[in-house]
Amino acid sequence: MSIRSNFVRLLKKQVNIIKLQKKCSHSVAVIGAPFSKGQKRRGVEHGPAAIRSAGLIDRLSNLGCNVCDFGDLHFSQVPNDEQYNSIVKHPRTVGLACKVLAKEVGKAVGAGHTCVTLGGDHSLAFGSITGHAQQCPDLCVIWVDAHADINTPLTTPSGNLHGQPVSFLLRELQDKIPPIPGFSWAKPCLSKSDIVYIGLRDLDPAEQFILKNYNISYYSMRHIDCMGIRKVMEKTFDQLLGRRDRPIHLSFDIDAFDPALAPATGTPVIGGLTYREGVYITEEIHNTGMLSALDLVEVNPVLATTSEEVKATANLAVDVIASCFGQTREGAHTRADTIIDVLPTPSTSYESDNEEQVRI
């Protein structure tokens, strides 16, 4: 990377930080999406409640955010929702849920909020990104996950739609997507150059083929080991923001973290992100000043073996979201009663000094 490009990035980063300091109050919409039909394991529908119970709303408020918690959406189970092609599960139910979520995310972003969607399983990202794109058609996506979620309905080995949302989003893959029941409303809204993956370490054969043959950018855990997370983020921003600033949609699956940190999730894969790597990603996204919407998905309290595992996973989810809005590891004090402009200076003499002289 040239010295000039490094200087330009540093200058843009400083300008964005100044903008963020001036705009100390983000307007944040929180939408709960308690949905689980994109996969087979019960409990992920309780993710929004677990994240809220871990103190999300208070944490965001203490960061100076104006938080509008819109509560949880209601998702209907479509009756007689037969499998597509004898493998794709709950297509009508998932399609309807994504349509409902797309509408609500679009409304929130259109009203000027940064939208936080609490999942729920990752099939929901098709809805949240579609709704976001309706308001911000030039958006880009950073997908942080152990999995690529880019199988098509014809390549999926499991039939679970939480492993397929990206294939529905990409224009380049639309000739590979059959007409799935429940998705007739859906239109692709991304090009392959609009998305970057971070944290991958469990890919199906068809996903490997798609990523390599369609030249989709991704950084696996091996890339992170070799390059370091700072370089990964620099290259990510070079691709997505190098030519122009544009809205960022962050889709963050909690299983991107190592299972030792996030045990309460449905598809854990050993060797994931450390706390420092994961939070560095979100701190750097915050510093761009371009975050417009984010998903935090796949927290599943039912799969934890102890209450401590539930707490650890939910607290980690809160830290991820909070660092998207200014929480840093140096501390983030934005409320008026915590900001210090001048350090106190002692006076030249104290009453205790005079008393000491009298005593002498």
Swiss-Prot record:
Q: Which Gene3D superfamilies does the entry link to?
A: Ureohydrolase domain
What is the protein name for this chain?
A: Arginase, non-hepatic 3
State the family it belongs to.
Answer: Belongs to the arginase family.
GO biological-process terms attached to the record: arginine catabolic process to ornithine; urea cycle
Alphabetically sorted, this entry's keywords are:
Arginine metabolism, Hydrolase, Manganese, Metal-binding, Urea cycle
Q: Whose protein is this, by species?
A: Xenopus laevis (African clawed frog)
Induced by what?
By thyroid hormone (T3).
Q: What class of enzyme is it?
A: hydrolase
Q: What molecular function does GO assign, one term?
A: manganese ion binding
Where does this protein hold Mn(2+) 2? 145, 147, 253, 255
Q: Which reaction does it catalyse?
A: L-arginine + H2O = urea + L-ornithine
Cysteine-cysteine disulfides? none
- Expressing tissues: Expressed at differing tadpole stages in tail, intestine, hindlimb and trunk region. Strongest in tadpole tail.
Cofactor(s) annotated in UniProt = Mn(2+)
EC number of the protein: 3.5.3.1
Pathway involvement of the protein, from the record: Nitrogen metabolism; urea cycle; L-ornithine and urea from L-arginine: step 1/1
